[in-house]
Regions:
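Short hydrophobic segments within beta-strands
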Residues: 6-8, 36-38, 103
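Short glycine-rich anion-binding loops that position phosphate/pyrophosphate groups of nucleotides
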Residues: 11, 75-78, 106-109
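Structured adenosyl-cofactor binding patch, chiefly the S-adenosyl-L-methionine
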Residues: 112-156
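Loop/turn-to-beta-strand initiation segments
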Residues: 2, 97-102
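Proline/glycine-rich low-complexity loops and linkers
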Residues: 105-106, 117
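Conserved RecA-like P-loop NTPase ATPase core
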Residues: 5, 71, 105, 138
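S-adenosyl-L-methionine/SAH cofactor-binding core of RNA-modifying enzymes
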Residues: 32-33, 37-98
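N-terminal beta1-alpha1 ligand-phosphate binding loop
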Residues: 1-27
């Protein structure tokens, strides 16, 4: 199975980029993992929130194939403990999913078209995090999930 994380906009926080890079390298030991960054929408001051979400959504949909399992990282998604997240990943792998795509939306969330296309939603917390910090949290949790599946001594209950 291939796993991809799609994010809107580049991060300007070197510390976040360093963490994401570190966990990406570690993850590639277990699974093919890639991050795709969609360029920020230009001239956002002239756009409504819904127009910005629509444009971001169009860019995201261009990267998704019909057979992909699309999971949105969304505040209204299912909350899982790390072990439950690992179990969900294992079920996806066993079900024959070829490409599992996670998406971190832009500052206003996702367009209706993205919500309609999504197969599921996952929440990392009831708290709100910046979209930049979510990249580091998510890649760490993904790495943690694979160490759980391999019974490696990273995760402690």
């Amino acid at each position: 199975m291939n796993i991809e994380l799609i994010v809107v906009g580049k991060t300007d926080m070197r510390e976040v980029e360093a963490l994401v890079s570190m966990y990406t390298k570690r993850l590639n030991h277990y699974v093919r993992f890639a991050i795709t960054t969609i360029a920020d929408v230009r001239n956002t001051k002239k756009l409504s929130e819904s127009e910005q979400k629509r444009l971001e959504g169009e860019a995201i949909l261009k990267l998704i194939s019909e057979s992909d399992h699309l999971m949105l990282l969304d505040e209204h998604g299912l909350e899982l403990r790390s072990i439950e997240f690992a179990d969900m990943l294992q079920r996806r792998m066993l079900s024959g999913t070829k490409r599992l795509v996670f998406v971190i939306g832009g500052p206003y969330g996702f367009s209706d078209a993205i919500y309609q296309r999504a197969n599921s939603k996952l929440s990392l917390s009831k708290m709100t995090f910046s979209h930049q910090i979510v990249r580091a949290i998510f890649t760490e949790q993904l790495y943690r999930a694979f160490t759980i599946l391999k019974n490696e001594p990273y995760h402690h209950e």
